[in-house]
């Protein structure tokens, strides 16, 4: 299975160690989403924009670990999207974004510019 990551799980980011058993397939940008800073990590929500990230091939054990990290407390929900590498899971932020900083470029690597 595949997963699209756009923040701290990306290469050389704070939580990239969770992806050590994953195979990077390539970069991908998804339209109709906006990226917000939650502090040390981002949240993507449906909206007018594009979010940039990476697609990985992962195993069931890695997905279970990521679900435990991302979906506890209802902060994110996993959603199936289509990528050039095939369908992939994406974690979509589930809480209100009012008061959060919009990352206008849609790229978490640009977060220090906002």
From Swiss-Prot:
It is found in: Cytoplasm. InterPro entries: AIG2-like_dom (IPR009288), GGACT (IPR039126), GGCT-like (IPR013024), GGCT-like_sf (IPR036568). It comes from the Bacteria. GO terms for molecular function: gamma-glutamylaminecyclotransferase activity. Keywords: Cytoplasm. SUPFAM superfamilies: Gamma-glutamyl cyclotransferase-like. GO terms for cellular component: cytosol. May play a role in antibiotic biosynthesis. Belongs to the gamma-glutamylcyclotransferase family. PANTHER family: GAMMA-GLUTAMYLAMINECYCLOTRANSFERASE (PTHR12510:SF4), TROPONIN C-AKIN-1 PROTEIN (PTHR12510). This is Gamma-glutamylcyclotransferase family protein ytfP. The gene is ytfP.
């Amino acid at each position: 299975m595949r997963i699209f990551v756009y923040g701290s799980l990306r290469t050389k980011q704070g939580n990239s160690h969770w992806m050590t058993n994953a195979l990077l397939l390539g970069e991908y940008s998804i339209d109709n989403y906006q990226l917000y800073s939650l502090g040390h990590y981002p949240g993507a929500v449906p909206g007018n924009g594009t979010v940039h990230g990476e697609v990985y091939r992962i195993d069931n054990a890695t997905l279970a670990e990521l679900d435990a990290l991302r979906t506890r407390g209802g902060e994110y929900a996993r959603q199936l999207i289509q990528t050039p590498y095939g369908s992939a899971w994406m974690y979509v932020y589930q809480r209100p974004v009012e008061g959060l900083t919009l990352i206008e470029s849609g790229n978490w690597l640009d977060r220090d510019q906002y």
